[in-house]
Every structure is written in C-alpha cells, then in structure tokens.
Amino acid sequence: MNPNFKAAGGNVEDLGEKVTELMGQGRAREDLAQLVLGTEKEASEIMPKATEGPIEGQPPAGMLKRYAHNPVLESVKNHPCESRYVLNGGAIKLEGKVYLVYRAVGEDNVSRLGLAVSDDGFRFKQRLDHPIFAPEEKAEAQGCEDPRLTRIGERIYMTYTAYDGMIAQVALASIPVDAFLHRRWNAWQRHGTVFPGITNKDAALFPEQFNEKFAMLHRVDPHMWVTFSPHLSCPWPRKMHKILAGATSGMMWDATKIGGGSQPIKSRFGWLLITHGVDYAHIYRLGVMLVDLENPAKLLYRSPNFILEPEDEWELGKDERSWVPRVVYTCGAVPRDGEKSILDADDEVIVYYGAADSVICAATACVGDLIPERLRWERRGYTWS
C-alpha cells in the first residue's frame, strides 16, 4: 500500500470506503489517484486531466425540433408497474421497428423496465402491461433505472442504473436479439455491476471495439468518463479510464455536472453523442458531442450551447402529476429512416427524452444540424476559412 495513503490515515480495510467518499466529492483526479498509487505516471493512466469545458472557438450546434404530438408515452393508471411515471427510454431499431425500453414507476416507487414498439418512431401502438426487466439482485432492490441499449453481434447489451436505496451503480445485462424479438424475457443475463461500490450513472456502450477493447461512457460526478475493457464481463478493470469532459465554470447550462445521454450513434464525422448537462438551478438540458471514430477518448466537438431545454408544459412539470420539474433527459436515439450503420449529414435522428421525469417525448434533427458545417468540412479533410 502506498505510504501516502497510510499517512493520510487510511488502511487497507477502509480503502473501498475512501474511494467512494473521494469520488463522491468530485476529488477523484487530483486526490484519489496519486494518494493511492503514489506516482503521477500511474495516476494519469487511471484519472488523467479532465477537459474543463467546451473546446474554445467551436461553433454552436443546431437545436432539436420537438415532435408536434408529444408526449409519445404516458403512464397507465391500470398498469400497476407504471401507474405513476414513465421516463428515460433506451431505444433500438430492429427489423424496421423502434423498440423503446423505458423506466416505469408504479405506486411502490420502484423502477422497472417496460416495452413499447412503434412502426414510425412516434406512435407506439404496441405496449406491454408488465415489465420486461425488474429488480432481482441486492444492488438493484429499489430500482432498475435509465436503460441504454446497444447491439453487439447477435446480443443486445443494456446498461442501466442499479439502485439499492443508498447507492446508484452502473449495471450490465444482455439478451439475444432473437429472444428479445420473441419476448423471451427469461433469456436476460445479468452480468453484474461494472464498477462495484462506486456511485456512477449515465452509462452507455459503444457498438464496436477499439484496439480489441470495448468502450463505455459513464459519469462519476461531475465528469463524463470513457472506460475501456478487453471483455464485457463484470467488473471492468480499474485502469484504462479517461475523463472525456468536465463540468463548465461559472453559470453555464452544464456548470454542475455533465453526463451521457443516448447510446453512441455512428456518423461519417465521428461518434455522435447526445449528452445532458445540469446548471446551478438544477435544470436539465441536452447537448451534443462528437468523438473520434477510431478513438472514442478523443473529443472532437462539444456544443457550447444546449440543443434542448425545458419549455413546454410536460418538461416544466408545473402540475401535480409531474415528478421532477424542469428536466429533459435522454437515454436513446435512433435513425428516423432505415437502419443505416453509419449516418451522413442529411440523415435524421429521433431523440427520445424523459420530460419532468414523468412522460416520454420525442424530438428530431438531421446529423448536419447537430454537427456544425465547419466541423463536418474539416472532418472530410478540407480547410475551413
């Protein structure tokens, strides 16, 4: 054990508690790594310097356009598992249909996961009256929350937040594509918590490997991280982490924390990330980032502006039916047309978001609207002047 850790009053038995405490205080980079590891080199491999805010001089992103008939999904009073709220749906497109796996809350205030299906991405005419995934393990006793779906080969991997009433952790489960399509929910396989004992949320897997390693976005407050692993089993390694983006300074829209949103979407210009940020008034807004196609730890673009903020009645949550007012928060997005593996500037995406943590809404934008023209020009190898 590092002598600096002992000098600080720590011992081996208390190490896990110390790790959780320092990360929860947002002191992970400068305090925890060198305290435990003792050398700057080793520390930088695990917790390198954060990107403090938007890259200087970058142009603003275009705004998302709300679907005219929001919300696309509401609670159902006679469904016990979702009689109070539905929110934060992970989305995946299979065989031409959009499958929305969403967080459902009933009278017991425990989060379970429901399923709705749409032919056009907006009208969800098929909907189950029972959950497809519910708490079973101790770590998720009080809820399985905020699912995000990624297809890797012939399996669908789902990251979600496991909540035991005290700590929220990133958990991972998977199911064969065929079993999902045929609704064989007993085929779900739980892989466990990804970073056991650490308060962590907003996780999403990339659908491809990078140098034979899988990659996952997640958030240890207040930063957005990317982590690599040679395997998909849990737990993931303690090394191969990088802080991708940090909360901004001052009174910006993402000043207190920033985190992931939808699963990564592959575009010709990079991996498109719909993110979220929170300000000092505790208002949740959406933003956008772009990371390199071959190295998702390389941030290419971070929107200086938000692309959606709470404005309408569903998002502001002014009535007694709303759970948390002034929130827009996404867990999923899909291409509007077709199932293209890589999107171009004129391809449109549908972003699903929880509004006031109470209903699910949809918004759209073309990739070219979210990624500014200058950046798209430069990514094609041209010089912008």
Q: What kind of region is each of these model predictions?
A:
Residues Y329-T330:
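Canonical pleckstrin homology
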